[in-house]
Design a protein with these regions (language model features):
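Helix-coil boundary and N-terminal low-complexity module in membrane systems
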Residues: 1-120, 127, 144-147, 151-247
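Alpha-helical transmembrane segments of multi-pass membrane proteins
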Residues: 129-141
């Protein structure tokens, strides 16, 4: 199944190259903007301004990423898209994207403070262990959040349900999620080579949405076969049969 996923991601990216490039250019310029915003904020002595600039940065980038979610879902479902769909989608994602950006920024800020305190200032073994636990919790959270935008785009759930399902998908498909995380890191590395014009956020969203769409076949299959009761039986999914119509 993973081999087919890689092939589909490449074909979908190539067939929608113009939209991928346009979205990535918008995201790239926004990225430059938030970098300058944070540089300006760091030049001040006001901690509140620094935190505010940091939070606004994640909210803005989240809005631009979420806006491409519906287009990525259409691409994953073999539907055509229009360039203007991306910009038209922005008003509809403002609430969820802002909450997501706020959530991520709060997690990062709390983690930064915790690591600074427990690893550098706390001299006890308990403090070190607590700091390590926080790091691992963050790893689980961010691995789960890989699925947030694809879940929202494919299932059209509200923020709370998307968050809940993100963790369910992660813990039920931990190995697959780790593979997708590594794949995302590879895409990010390749994006740097292409100066962010190709692959980048649009390519990653297409890849993750394709991954979730194919993975959901597993749950359709298990629902149709309630006799597969044990964990061992539920692991044997006939992927070649399930993705046959997509080939």
């Amino acid at each position: 199944m993973f081999g087919f996923l890689l092939k589909k991601n490449f074909c979908d990216g190539w067939d929608n190259l113009l939209s991928v490039v346009i979205v990535n250019v918008v995201f790239l310029f926004a990225g430059f903007g938030v970098v300058f915003l944070n540089i300006f904020a760091r030049a001040t002595d006001a901690i509140l301004i620094k935190i505010l600039a940091f939070t606004i940065s994640f909210i803005v980038l989240s809005i631009l990423a979420f806006a491409y979610g519906d287009s990525a879902a259409k691409i994953a479902n073999f539907e055509g898209i229009h360039i203007l769909d991306y910009f038209k989608a922005i008003p509809g994602v403002l609430k969820d994207a802002s909450l997501f950006g706020l959530l991520v920024s709060v997690i990062i800020l709390l983690t930064t403070f915790s690591i600074k305190y427990y690893f550098t200032q706390s001299e006890s073994m308990f403090g070190f262990m607590l700091g390590a636990a926080i790091v691992w919790i963050d790893v689980f959270i961010f691995l789960s959040l890989i699925w947030f935008i694809p879940i929202r785009s494919l299932m059209h759930n509200n923020f709370k349900k998307c968050l809940k399902k993100s963790f369910i998908i992660f813990f039920d498909n931990t190995g697959f999620t780790l593979a997708i995380a590594v794949y995302n890191l590879v895409l990010i590395a390749l994006s740097v080579l292409f100066v962010g014009f190709i692959l980048s956020i649009a390519g990653i969203l297409i890849a993750n949405t394709n991954a979730l769409r194919l993975r959901l076949y597993k749950y359709d299959y298990l629902e149709e076969h309630p006799e597969l009761a044990t964990k061992k039986e539920r692991k044997h999914i006939p992927w070649e049969e399930l993705i046959y119509d997509d080939r």
